[in-house]
Regions:
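RNA pseudouridine synthases
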Residues: 1-140
Length: 140
């Protein structure tokens, strides 16, 4: 069963010269570990689009200096049972005690089982940005 990330990731399209490449080719080059067919499937499934909401097709050309949003997918994701603890929160700062084995941000096979996604869910704040990223094996 394909698992889709709860929140989109961002990719900025740089200033490039004409002729502009297809977005699918740019993404394949930018994210070389992801097969082109996976990008085609994401695009056809509506999981890749411009930040303004405009749909992208496999024939869409890059538009320099624009933002793409895309949803990561994985075939399976292991549930991480350890819980984070919010230790301080105000309008500008959120301090959290992160458990072992929980990645800070979506990466690799962890697209929903990560601290950032959990905190967005818990607080309702989709603008959270980590300022200290410790690795998956580290707690604190």
């Amino acid at each position: 069963m394909l698992i889709i990330a709860k929140y989109p990731s961002k990719c900025f399209l740089p200033a490039i010269e004409k002729p502009y490449p297809l977005i699918v080719d740019f993404l394949k080059t930018r994210f070389s570990r992801i097969p082109k067919q996976q990008w085609v499937d994401r695009i056809n499934g509506g999981l890749v689009f411009f930040k303004n909401g405009k749909k992208i097709t496999t024939e869409s050309l890059c538009v320099p200096l624009t933002m793409l949003l895309y949803y990561r997918t994985v075939d399976e994701e292991i549930s991480i049972p350890f819980k984070e603890k919010i230790i301080y929160m105000d309008d500008n700062i959120l301090a959290v005690n992160k458990p072992h084995f929980l990645p800070v941000m979506p990466a690799g096979k962890y697209i929903n089982q990560n601290l950032l996604t959990r905190l967005k869910d818990k607080t309702g704040n989709n603008d959270i940005v980590p300022v200290n990223r410790i690795d998956r094996e580290t707690s604190g």
